Swiss-Prot record:
Keyword Magnesium included in the entry's annotation: no
Organism: Mus musculus (Mouse)
Designated name of the protein: Transcription factor MafG
Residue ranges of domain bZIP in the record: 51-114
Key words, A-Z: Acetylation, DNA-binding, Isopeptide bond, Nucleus, Phosphoprotein, Repressor, Transcription, Transcription regulation, Ubl conjugation
């Protein structure tokens, strides 16, 4: 016996004594619309209707669970990829930070050397120039005295750290 559908399809319904159910495949049961299912269920006993609806619900839930698993795996892979990228960025920034700390230490050393030199020069009194050229030079100014020694001190400390 066939039950004609409003569309072009015809659903086959086997109803033989002792057989509860129809000749629907799982795929057909899951993919058919509610309207098609209701048309298919007409004329079946309540027990058969409940059984078919329960089977359909179970199959649909399996499909939903499978798609959720796929989605979860995809999201996990994406998050792991982002995590790896962020870890690389953290390592890069840590390396930059370490090199900047070294540069800062070198600059501090230069600054301290300059401060020490400035204190030394500031403490020494202005000495009048002596010797045959003294008349042309005048008194020695602390800022001009030993300017090359500052450069030497700073350069030697920087080279020692490199």
């Amino acid at each position: 016996m066939t039950t004609p559908n409003k569309g072009n399809k015809a659903l086959k319904v086997k109803r033989e004594p002792g057989e509860n159910g129809t000749s629907l495949t799982d795929e057909e049961l899951v993919t058919m619309s509610v309207r098609e299912l209701n048309q298919h269920l007409r004329g079946l006993s309540k027990e058969e209707i409940i059984q078919l609806k329960q089977r359909r619900r179970t199959l649909k839930n399996r499909g939903y669970a499978a798609s959720c698993r796929v989605k979860r795996v995809t999201q996990k892979e994406e998050l792991e990829k982002q995590k790896a990228e962020l870890q690389q960025e953290v390592e890069k920034l840590a390396s930059e930070n370490a090199s900047m700390k070294l540069e800062l230490d070198a600059l501090r050393s230069k600054y301290e050397a300059l401060q020490n030199f400035a204190r030394t020069v500031a403490r020494s009194p202005v000495a009048p120039a002596r010797g045959p050229l003294a008349a042309g030079l005048g008194p020695l100014v602390p800022g001009k005295v030993a300017a090359t020694s500052v450069i030497t001190i700073v350069k030697s400390k920087t080279d020692a750290r490199s």
